[in-house]
Amino acid sequence: MSENTDSTHEKLIFAPSRYQYEKSSLHRDALMGKDPLVLFNQWFQEATDDEGIKSPESTTLSTARLPSGRVSSRLVLLKELDHRGFIIFTNLGTSKKAKDLKSNPYASLSFWWEPLQRQVRVEGIIERLSREETEEYFKTRPRNSRIGAWASPQSEVIADREELEKRVEEYKKKFGEDESVPVPVPDFWGGIRIVPLEIEFWQGGKYRLHDRFSFRRNTLDEDYELVRLAP
């Protein structure tokens, strides 16, 4: 028998699992009657307090464009949590996520806090923040970050980094460097809130028998139902 030399079947990565999850466990009785957003805040604070987690606010935002159904994901930063949901800020004009959300208002978030062996998944509907809410946050950004929001046509093709740096310099000249002179919010930039239909809390368990509990509802007007999911 001749040796198969087809490189398309060659393993580029082979990662047999050796890592065991043994930190903690989740029990239904401890979750019953809890507001999942309050529970998320509790987990987030524990992640923030863990010295091994440098950026607990990092989360993977996934969106899908219709009618193709093509999915795209990217790391973003959670900036706020309120009684309705999870808030991030972004370019809402040229970015891929903005184009996806124009055709499909559903999105998901995934938080992974490895030292705690915890994951939180969020599925929900996007709603845009008001101009006033966006302006309130925009003022907290460093001045150069505010200028960067104007300068970057996010996700558009550019020739090279020099083109981007040239745009930054142009907007620096336009707005000046006097901190007392505000940099306005671009019309194409703003905040979005992911209002949850489902929030899943995942705690790693021995032998991959993880604890998974989902707070879920079919519409935003309903109360959440708590269910356990098989790992």
From Swiss-Prot:
Binds 1 FMN per subunit. The keyword Oxidoreductase applies. Pyridoxal 5'-phosphate binds at Q20, Y21, E22, K23, K79, Y137, R141, S145, R208, L209, H210. Pathway: Cofactor metabolism; pyridoxal 5'-phosphate salvage; pyridoxal 5'-phosphate from pyridoxamine 5'-phosphate: step 1/1; Cofactor metabolism; pyridoxal 5'-phosphate salvage; pyridoxal 5'-phosphate from pyridoxine 5'-phosphate: step 1/1. The keyword Oxidoreductase applies. Keywords: Flavoprotein, FMN, Oxidoreductase, Pyridoxine biosynthesis. Its cofactor is FMN. InterPro entries: Pyridox_Oxase, Pyridox_Oxase_CS, Pyridox_Oxase_N, Pyridoxamine_oxidase_dimer_C, Split_barrel_FMN-bd. It catalyses: pyridoxamine 5'-phosphate + O2 + H2O = pyridoxal 5'-phosphate + H2O2 + NH4(+); pyridoxine 5'-phosphate + O2 = pyridoxal 5'-phosphate + H2O2. One of its GO terms (biological process) is pyridoxine biosynthetic process. One of its GO terms (molecular function) is FMN binding. It is an enzyme of class 1 (oxidoreductase). It comes from the Eukaryota. Pfam families: PNP_phzG_C (PF10590), PNPOx_N (PF01243). Its EC number is 1.4.3.5. FMN binds at R74, L75, V76, L77, F89, T90, K96, K97, Q119, Q154, S155, W202, R212. Homodimer. Catalyzes the oxidation of either pyridoxine 5'-phosphate (PNP) or pyridoxamine 5'-phosphate (PMP) into pyridoxal 5'-phosphate (PLP). Belongs to the pyridoxamine 5'-phosphate oxidase family. This is Probable pyridoxamine 5'-phosphate oxidase. The lineage of its organism: Eukaryota, Fungi, Dikarya, Ascomycota, Taphrinomycotina.
